Amino acid sequence: MTWQAYIDTNLIGSGFISAQILSSADGSSWANSNGFSVSATEAQHILSCFKDSNKASAMGITINNVKNFVLKADDKSIYAKKDAGGVVLVKTNQTILVAVYNSNLQPGAAANACEALGDYLREQGF
């Protein structure tokens, strides 16, 4: 399966409105949904937040120029919220999944879908 297929099938197909797969090494983009792109500055901030989860909690996570309030952050996942939507970020050995949802997808379902793909990618060595 291509990286784009993971986006289209596993994330957008689960109800996310936007998604992107980044390299966990340097933050470069491997695949993204139509019209969605995390900026280089945002990607570097995401990388630093996975190294220091306190930074995520203190500064929040900005995705596509939208600042999200961080609810949970550790070295494997970051959950953040903005109004009725939010973002789920999941880090694997080689990737960072970035998945944005709105009020049509419940936060718990969003976290489960993104975490399930993250678990699968870890099992596959990614």
UniProtKB/Swiss-Prot annotation:
InterPro entries noted in UniProt: PFN, PFN_euk, PFN_sf, Profilin_CS
Keyword RNA-binding: no
Lyase recorded as keyword: no
Keywords: Actin-binding, Cytoplasm, Cytoskeleton
One GO BP: chemotaxis to cAMP
Function noted in UniProt: Binds to actin and affects the structure of the cytoskeleton. At high concentrations, profilin prevents the polymerization of actin, whereas it enhances it at low concentrations. By binding to PIP2, it inhibits the formation of IP3 and DG.
Subunit-level organization: Occurs in many kinds of cells as a complex with monomeric actin in a 1:1 ratio.
Family of the protein in this entry: Belongs to the profilin family.
Record protein name field: Profilin-3
